[in-house]
Amino acid sequence: MIDLHMHTVYSDGDKTVEEILKLCEEKHLEYISITDHNNCMQYKDEAFNKNIFSGKVIKGVELQGSVLNKCIEILAYDYNIDILSEWINKYFSEEKLRERRNNQKVRFLEICDKNGLKYDESKIIYPKKVTAFIERSIYDEIIRYEENREKLGEYAKHFGLFYRKCLTNIESPFYMNYTIDYPTYEEIVDSIHMAGGKAFLAHPFEYKFNNTLEFIDEIRKIRELDGIECYHPSAEEDNRINILKEYANKNNLYISGGSDYHGSPKPDIEIGSGKGSLQIHKDIIEKWHRD
């Protein structure tokens, strides 16, 4: 089995690289990729020198971008780490992340004010890591109040749902325009290819679009993808994995997959198995990865 999508303390996960490698070894995974958001620092971690994990590691990173007024993520694999890191630093350096985080806080609170949501700004805790989402901290503050939870309804259940259906949904009164924060989809794909890597659309059903396959068709007209992440917890139900695999095969796209493990931020997700039924065989990478 393999798992090509997981996060550590280098982005918004809560496990160190060493802890992740130990978990992957315990699960007897054959291939893994640690795909932290918008940086490749995880691969410079000293844990890789400790012979903790006996399987093989594919370099990966998850890059945030915008396309058609929507926020998406692109998974890059098998890239030249120096070349891609140089490009990433233009958009996601520590200085830029701090500036962006401050701007996003102001914009999110303006949205809260406009929608009559109660909050105490002094209770909003800045994450220690600049790679973590300030929006999650603000969300944790607003759902402390019962009147806010009543207004948000089902979107008060967890941040991921609020992020996908409200903050990044142009039709929502809580929409926050992330297109000014992130590189475009085509810039990301071009940069991955310049670094010799392959670009996969991450978790298509995670975005909760009305017509996921039509959306993939549209962005492929802008820039062709190398592949799609067909195996993901968001696709574990309603035959979605097979729907994506069928689309990928029909359109000559490669297939990838992973649990999107974060640790306690996503407590229902386990490495290697997602929500429980995710099983990803290594044969899916035979067409696009060579050791």
Predicted regions and their residues:
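Amphipathic, non-transmembrane alpha-helical secondary structure
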Residues: E18-E25, E186, D190, L213-K221, ...
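Structural recognition of alpha->loop->beta junctions
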Residues: I216-Y231, I269-D291
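Surface-exposed cleft-lining segments at the edges of enzyme active sites
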Residues: I124-V130, F162-T179
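Active-site gating loops and adjacent loop-to-helix segments of metal-dependent hydrolytic enzymes
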Residues: S66-K96, Y139, I143-P173, S273-R290
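Secondary-structure boundary motif
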Residues: E26, F48-I52, M194, K221, ...
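A metal-dependent hydrolase metal-coordination microenvironment
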Residues: M1-R144, G227-N251, S256-D268
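Active-site core of metal-dependent hydrolases
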Residues: K198-Y207, L225-A235
